Amino acid sequence: NVKILEKIYDFTKEKIDFKFHTCIKSVEVKDSNSFVVKTDSGEEYSCGNLVLATGRSGSKWIGSVCDKLGIAQKSNRVDIGVRVELAAEIFKHITDDVYESKIVYKTDKYNDMVRTFCMNPYGEVVAENTNGIVTVNGHSYSQESLRTENTNFALLVSNKFTEPFKDSNEYGESIAR
């Protein structure tokens, strides 16, 4: 919700320096209590606390920063699935009461948990391009004039990896390719 994000930003903007759309060249430990961040445009920033928010598309880069700084990493789960679109009327009895409903099914054979995610009543399926890999996502609109006659949601199965194969992002990308 944009209003919530605006409130978070307004609350923190006097306490935190935000740098958006900034390409970082390196992150170094200055001493035990501070960092130096260098950008590709030659700027340098020093700080005691550092939050790097790269998102999934920057996971390889942030992994290399962690390796360089000796920060332990943990393999995350990866969600593999499809986006389902159907007539909104089919789920209306659910989405009119619970906008973002979660439906979970446990398979008999492997005990996998299959779940819905990101339900979009009266929404649309859209293409997304992340690092040259095209995937799909869904949107819905509060403005009635933009609504469609369809509802869409992701149907996902989660996988968690351990040694020796632990790169869940690479696995997800290989499936998407």
Regions found by a protein language model. Give the residues of each.
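Residues forming the flavin
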Residues: 1-177
